[in-house]
C-alpha cells in the first residue's frame, strides 16, 4: 500500500508530456512525375541541415497530406519540394535558383536562400494542421 501511494505521488509530480500531431497539406503540385519530399525540423540549429522526421510521397494528385505523429509540444519548421526526377535533391540552375517547386511552413520566403527557422516556425502545443503552397 505504501508503495502504491509513493508511486501515485511521484506520478502526479511528473506529468506526462502530451504527444501531438502535425498534419501538413502540400498544394500546387504541377505534374504527376516523381515524389514530394517533406522534412520536419525542431530547432534553428538543425533547420535545413538535419531533420528529425521526413516523408516521401509519390505524386498522385495536385495536393497531398502527410502527418507527423508523437510530437512533443514545441516549435517546428517544415520544408518540402517536388522531386520530379527522383534524385532526392532540390535541383537548381547555375545561379542557385531552384528548378523544382518548393515551399516552407507559414509559406515563408527567404532572400537568396531558405527562410529563417523563425519565419517558418510553427508552434505545436496541440494537434495542428498547416498548408504549404509550392512555388
Name every feature range the model reports, one short phrase each:
Residues 86-90:
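Acidic, glycine-anchored loop motifs typical of Ca2+
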Residues 1-21:
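Bacterial Sec-dependent N-terminal signal peptides
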Residues 100-135:
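Extracellular beta-sheet/turn segments enriched in Thr/Pro/Gly and aliphatic residues
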Residues 20-29, 132:
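A short, amphipathic beta-strand motif
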Residues 31, 72-73, 124:
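Surface-exposed loops/turns
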Residues 26-33, 43:
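Structural motif
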Residues 76-80:
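A short tyrosine-centered beta-strand micro-motif
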Residues 62, 67, 72-75:
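A glycine-anchored, Pro-Gly-centered beta-turn/N-cap motif
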